Regions:
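Long, contiguous binding/interaction regions
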Residues: 1-110
């Protein structure tokens, strides 16, 4: 299954993927049980020109897994980034999260 780069044209699919997460999964992804409005604000504020997002789509072209590598805006922390990953419940156990993490590490090193 290929990993694709995501851009602002994928914003609606990112929103749908994240809002489909169950409360416990939202807590794991965001560090708190984000509600739909909080997720919408998060997606609206993604800085695609600075950050890097990767996704995996199923055969129906639904986003089933995604990773967000968010780089610090603080000039003193230019080498710092935050990583977030989520995988749709039905797609877990297939190594998608690990593959997205590996891709993010390679990108961050370069």
């Amino acid at each position: 299954v290929p990993i694709r780069s995501l851009d602002s044209g994928h914003r609606d699919q990112i929103l749908a993927h994240l809002q489909a997460l169950e409360p416990a999964d939202r807590y794991l992804r965001f560090g708190y049980a984000a509600n739909d409005e909080q997720i919408r604000r998060y997606v609206d504020q993604i800085a695609f020109e600075r950050d890097v997002l990767f996704g995996i789509f199923n055969r129906r072209l639904h986003l089933i897994a995604m990773a967000h590598l968010a780089f610090s805006v603080d000039p003193q922390l230019r080498t710092c980034a935050e990583f977030g990953v989520s995988v749709a419940k039905a797609s877990r156990g297939k190594g998608y999260g690990s593959r997205l993490f590996e891709r993010a590490v390679v990108h961050a090193r370069n």
